[in-house]
Amino acid sequence: MNKIFKVGLVGCGHISETYFKSHEYFNNFQIIKCADINMEVANKCAEVNNIEACSVDELIKDKEIEIILNLTIPKAHYEIAKKSLENGKHIYSEKPMAVNFEDGKHLLQLSTEKGLYIGNAPDTFLGGGIQKSIELVSSGTIGDIKLGNAIFAFPGVQSYHPNPEPWFAEKEGGPVIDMGP
């Protein structure tokens, strides 16, 4: 029988609904508690999903929790991940892992030191298309790359998110920080 990991979810906003709906298709983890900086939101999430709500600090320090699922806004990802690792928790976070390279590097070093796993969504960056691209570039089939261009035709977070304002706050990066990584 597979081990069932006990997961604590931080950030009970819009994206958490997707995780709650899809987690029932997996038999190796169970979201047992949730937290949010807004306790009203955490309590509502807990009630809807029949789990326990608590503060962010309580969740991160909870001995029963093995993995923290970090669904907060990008500028909070680093602090939540850092505290989680410091408290012996594996961490899986929405993108990006951190809003700057140094913080991301620090999280990877910390996870290695602690012997913990750290992962990020979307995991499609390691999918077939990207792996094939890496293969073609590495083998020299494509040749030296001199320029890259990307087009992402999507109306942005404001088209679907019930509360897009935090994404556009100072230093948040807007759609680029959401879709770019």
Which residues are covered by each model-predicted region?
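N-terminal Rossmann-like dinucleotide-binding module
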Residues: 1-48
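Conserved G/P- and acidic residue-centered "switch" motifs that form tight phosphate/ATP-binding loops
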Residues: 11, 95, 140
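Beta-loop-alpha module in the N-terminal Rossmann-like domain of NAD(P)-dependent dehydrogenases
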Residues: 19, 51-110
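Acidic-histidine catalytic/liganding microenvironments
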Residues: 26, 48, 62-63, 127
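Short, Asp-centered acidic motifs that coordinate Mg2+ and/or phosphate
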Residues: 33, 66-67, 147
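Rossmann-fold dehydrogenase core element
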Residues: 106-124, 143-148
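Predominantly a Rossmann-like dinucleotide-binding segment in NAD(P)-dependent oxidoreductases
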Residues: 124-181
